[in-house]
């Protein structure tokens, strides 16, 4: 111990302060991703695969090569610019590239006017998907399982460049609702098979427009939004399910949507039913409901949760990958956010975590060992540490 203490060198200001002669900048590794069990290290000019056991890096492709391949193609699904003989938008870097196919050497490249599926082993173009072209789509949601792409243009929803809705101003489809409360951050939800799309439809025509000042342009402009003031009428939300194959939409038969919140949408693993947590406007009564994805009819109310002050559902249910009859429900019923194991009949099997600390996030599963991986504040509310929880 004495020798080790003598060998330790105390850091100097030159070591610690940026600009010091001996200051060492720690390498930043942004946007690391997984392709199956292989770690992907994206860069500006190159894309590397990293062996997680050895750390060995293997070059997959380069930005120059990808751009050469893409700019040499004119395909039936290409953008208007490409069809007219102009070059596609160039890939500027690999940081927003995704790898949603663990069993295929494909990557998803997001360009301003098109999504590209690219084979990085063969350096070949696989598929191109315009994501709105000149219409400037937002809220883009791509399903690798079904190969469909959903997006919104202004207040309407499109799938594969076909209009799903044609609503007037005051009715918004495919976007986040309920002022982004209760864990809501998006408005479209693909089924696990990628053949059905659940989406929000929000009627806010009864809500009085509220003026906001946009100071972005040189001369400020008034931008009106519909904001439900306390004690006044709130917007009404419904949930639709669109089938790209038939191009038909079924809406859930939820009844009168007045003063009701429909939150935390999730799909059954087989895609035959849709789950959501309904909340009243007083926010003291929540219900977990299951709907038939073909008919939109209510199949069952699995459980209800009430509290004298409030309940605050923030997370959709999450099915166990090794047993589709069981799912994890998150609740603050004992004062802290914890995990509860339920079956699809609505029966509580057991509480998986407990204590005066929060489960912050479910990070994934270890299916072989029947474990769920979580981040929590168990050690300290100032820290976030990783834990594994045995489900069996």
What are these regions (language model features)?
Residues 1-2:
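Bacterial N-terminal signal peptides
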Residues 5-392:
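Beta-propeller folds
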